């Protein structure tokens, strides 16, 4: 945590006042509008208290399934600067517009370690590209885990599915492009839906069979061919709400919505599966089971389906959110119900409805609150869907001090209970957890805290598996510097102290840039101010209760309490308080003490629970008892005066208890009017009452104490403190928030504490615990709390409120405890609850009936040696107006704290809905305070006077002198106080009116609900009674009347009915016969006609034919099949068998006859051919012998002729080949020799020239050299590859022929074809000038060289720039003359092209 020196004092002070509910009216916005909004510096991270695990005692008024929201008045603006360490946990969000600045340690380049509250388990290694994915890369259920990857060989998209229990894996393939989104129907569902970039939908059912994952394709819908790939596609399942009667259900909703770029589609999967059995199916072939919604101008980004599937909400990049009424089964088009721009038209990226999907209360409507996000969720807004008003705005911004300020790109997800919103930044290695509170009745919802958890890599996508309550070990609660201090206390209390606090466990599966990881986060949430019952869990699990003896709690015992530990508060040091926190003099500098100063050990927890308390406790134990009145811890740290800041035993109090007693509230309203006025002038109210420095205060003598203060001191002594253990060492109270009359539940017995005890939220305090002696010991402890008391404006307002002249007015003023207890007795007269003891009555009876000498001596010593202002001093940092805090919430907080300890005497309990209206402080607390004050003035004055007479002080003159001096000061300040009182009362009228109206409305609503319940119960009881009476009456009547009635009715029927019936039926029978005959004739004719028409009708005949065909088809088919199988087939088989036998016999006989005839014919044919073959064979034998003789003769002749011819041809060929070889060799040798001789000549010539140059006194000009020698030398340079030297030597000779010799020898492509150009810029300029001097001869060669040389000029060279203009002008002139001389020359085109090039080069250089 950063140093406190960087905190702006005014801003930090204002924030602390807001946390402690100071300068904040309960119902009005007048004071809120007057107070300037101040930013909250992020260096105060960790001051808000986490919410422990609520065990619940049955008194909670919150509805199940909804996190109740305390009535918090949010500021206008707040800035939270995250620190990047484990102290950035549960940072309070206290404003309507909040800016959250990312920490520098969360950047990717940071070397900071990950959070200790995060446990990471690798699942799979894979490299994902770091970018913002609009869809989900991962889907999580209780049984399976699915994430999108790409194949290593071909890059095709796939989905890997892993079993959470067995780690078995499988792959799902068949996608087009990448996987745009994937999601399970719900956590207990095995149905996985995937959507690829082409818009194809896949729905699988996964199952684990014999240790292997089996996937079954349920739905596969393909988009048309050529659909463009788009990553703006999302899958939205209809939310699954489990029924209360079922524990777990794996059935999922059949409705799913698909968001495409320009439209949304809602599909009924059951209808699709009933109409199609094979997959895939083209979307064009589906005619029913889906509906298309269009209405956005740009691509859709998010959506949500209502639980009944009839309303679809869509968010788009055009900035609109629209709600559509949809009916899949009907023909109605989607109807837009509502639309609005939540973020002023910026692209939307988030749409979340805050519904509890774990257990939904039937009385709570869906879609009550809505979270929207824009600009990749850099801005989040909370909306009320009833009034469409923005309840809160959260903005995320980068660290302004970072070198690379990358804007956040956040992925958000809300857990099923709608209590925590989890965010990951794609650009940073961090996770944020924001706590969400809702109040359905008031229509309010807000983010109450944010926690930062550093990771090792950025999270690209994540899926929530579990968000649940857990118990944190002691080492998970305390910071690192406190763990060593807590080891001793842990060893003394055993292993039971290891689980020291309630926490939250969040299990995620996160896709990082390098791997897929199982992430578990354990942290302690923020304390919910309206339900403060952390000690109830302690009682339930460890049976930590008190007996009848009162325990004395020391700070050591409190330090070892295992509950409600909070991040370290010792990080904040030396934070001065503003002027309006305590009315101090300018010389008195307030100091902020660390919690270590308030942790002085006095007794261990075991000693506290075992040993009874004594009536005279020490100051440290008393302060510990007062500081342990509630289990909640401090929400902020503020300053205290120098007189009390140095006392480590001074108690403090949590913010839930900052409502003062009515008397002190009214008095305090005179001094602390508003934060703005007191900050401007801290001493403007009571300048006469502000003393000097604390070390210069004059000790008050006995003469300074009036009778009223003596009575007050005695009253304080008779209050017994009830010790309630503090939660943990980190819950040490703030030094300036000193426990007062409204701190300890029974120490002062204020109005709030009495109400909490009397209303019975927990176990009541035993009557034996409150005795006069114990109250006296508590008062002694209160006296010892302030070793250096000081005066304050509260004292003057307390003593001189009525403003009457004389001492009688001051003597008649009731004390703080009298006002509090008298009011409590009045408010609970009509109740049956046990009330707090009347300290005034007990004091009076003690003094008059049975005075105790020891008590009187103690009281005298305290009264005469202690200033009477010690109690009022404890209230100088609290809110002094009853309307400036929510009274009922504080009563509930105290009741929850007191209810955490068991008691042996049960107390009647009032229903949670009725206690607010019966004796509630909301029913005009000012009227009650005024009436109680007026009623108690005379009685208290008389008792005080009696006490004063009974025990007169010893130093009477000094007391009178001191009273006179104080009376003069009080009279001087009383006038100003009364004026301010009038102004304050006028300003408070509207606030009191609002309180009364709200109380009446609440009472009316409660009475209305109670009346409705009573009417319903009455109607139910009336119905039951009526049914019972009906049954009894029917039974009685049936038993009494049945026998008699049956006999009488039978006799009467026999006598009367037959004659009457016969007489009445005779005319009727005649009429019936006539009408029947008439009707029958008519019906007969009409039936004949209709039957004839019907028989002639084509439709009837067709119908009869179809019916007959349908009827006879089956029997006829069966008959034909039976007849064919039994009759036709056997007969056909027999006939075929006989036929094939006959055919076989005939074929065998015919074949035998044919073979016999063929044999005889072949024999005769053979004999005839043999007879004709004999002469032919003899003739052939003669011809063969003749041919053999001729062949031998011919072979000899041919071989001799061929040999002679071959010899002749070889002789001729060898002669010609010899001649050609000789000629070729001569030519080659001649060429080689000539070249060698030329080289030798050139070498000799060069040697001679070098010798001549060395012998001469001056260099010989190259112009006088022999042209042949120069050519030889140039040729040698060209052969050696020195082109630039060869051209330079030819150009230096100033001989155009020599230049042409070089140009002819070297090809232009060889010179200018190699980059860079080997010729220097001066050589190029000289070559251009000399070649252009005469274009009449060898024009083609010159033009080609000129064109190449001009193109290779370097215009950036200074030499070229200086001479290029003149040379180019000369060349252009020569080209012009060449064209004029011969316009029709074939080279004119090349010359004109070169002229145009030169014109472009020369023109810019001209002036």
Swiss-Prot record:
PROSITE patterns: WD_REPEATS_2, WD_REPEATS_REGION
Subcellular localization: Cytoplasm, P-body; Nucleus
Modified residues (N-acetylalanine): 2
Modified residues (Phosphoserine): 3, 6, 560, 565, 583, 585, 681, 713, 728, 730, 734, 746, 850, 877, 881, 885, 893, 896, 898, 1386
Name of one Pfam family that matches: EDC4_C
Entries under InterPro entries matching the protein: EDC4-like, EDC4_C, EDC4_C_sf, EDC4_WD40, WD40/YVTN_repeat-like_dom_sf, WD40_repeat_dom_sf, WD40_rpt
Main location: cytoplasm
Subunit structure: Part of a decapping complex consisting of DCP1A, DCP2, EDC3, EDC4 and probably DDX6. Part of a complex consisting of DCP1A, EDC3, EDC4 and DDX6. Part of a complex consisting of DCP1B, EDC3, EDC4 and DDX6. Interacts with DCP2. Interacts with NBDY. Interacts with Tex19.1. Interacts with LSM14A. Interacts with DDX6.
Protein name (record): Enhancer of mRNA-decapping protein 4
Organism name: Rattus norvegicus
